[in-house]
């Protein structure tokens, strides 16, 4: 990631804590208001949880300390004061694995038992790290790739089952989306080398 106001001569990782450092130095990390900021202006809350990369999670609600809501991730939580409360209640995050079964289950547990049951934000987001994490390491069509897709489908099914069991399916709209797909490639491109 190139942020000239932060580092005029080099790239940085698009991860947390680097993005926090960008926000601290430049005053912001995004050029447009977040969904959390817009909702907060109308008395509503946005909460996000995910086990993907820390940068993707951070960008969901980087201003939770100011505008409310939360971003919950294995490596950090915003607002930072929420982290210990969640650890005390739900335990430490499981180690990352392929497929990322235990972390995805941990996300779902926090989503259903805390976010949707107690905080009841107007908008909630769960970012599944699968099949993305596994497909970075294993080709499309591999057994790991299929296991990761099955894992993602299973956790989505668990969420839908929870909504039915708790009688919430009529008052919560669920949308699914993917940020990208995968295909077989013959080589990678050294982007940093090209711009460095």
Per-region residue spans from a language model:
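Active-site-proximal segments of metal-dependent phosphoesterases and phosphodiesterases across multiple
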Residues: 137-153
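Alpha-helical packing segments of well-folded alpha/beta enzyme cores
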Residues: 35, 107-111, 148, 152-159
């Amino acid at each position: 990631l190139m942020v000239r106001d932060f580092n005029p001569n080099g790239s940085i990782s698009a991860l947390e804590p680097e993005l926090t450092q960008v926000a601290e130095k430049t005053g912001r990390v995004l050029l447009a208001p977040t969904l959390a900021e817009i909702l907060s202006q109308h008395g509503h809350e946005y909460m996000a949880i995910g086990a993907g990369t820390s940068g993707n999670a951070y960008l969901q609600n980087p201003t939770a300390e100011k505008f409310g809501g939360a971003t919950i991730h294995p490596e950090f939580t915003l607002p930072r004061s929420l982290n210990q409360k969640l650890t005390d209640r739900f335990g430490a995050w499981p180690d990352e694995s392929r497929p990322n079964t235990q972390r995805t289950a941990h996300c779902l547990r926090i989503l259903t038992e805390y976010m949707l049951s107690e905080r009841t934000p107007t908008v909630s987001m769960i970012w599944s790290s699968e099949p993305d994490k596994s497909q970075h390491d294993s080709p499309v069509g591999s057994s790991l790739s299929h296991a990761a897709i099955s894992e993602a489908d299973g956790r989505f099914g668990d969420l839908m089952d929870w909504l039915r069991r708790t009688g919430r399916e009529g008052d919560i709209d669920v949308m699914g989306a993917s940020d990208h797909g995968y295909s077989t490639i013959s080589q990678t491109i050294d982007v940093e080398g090209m711009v460095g």
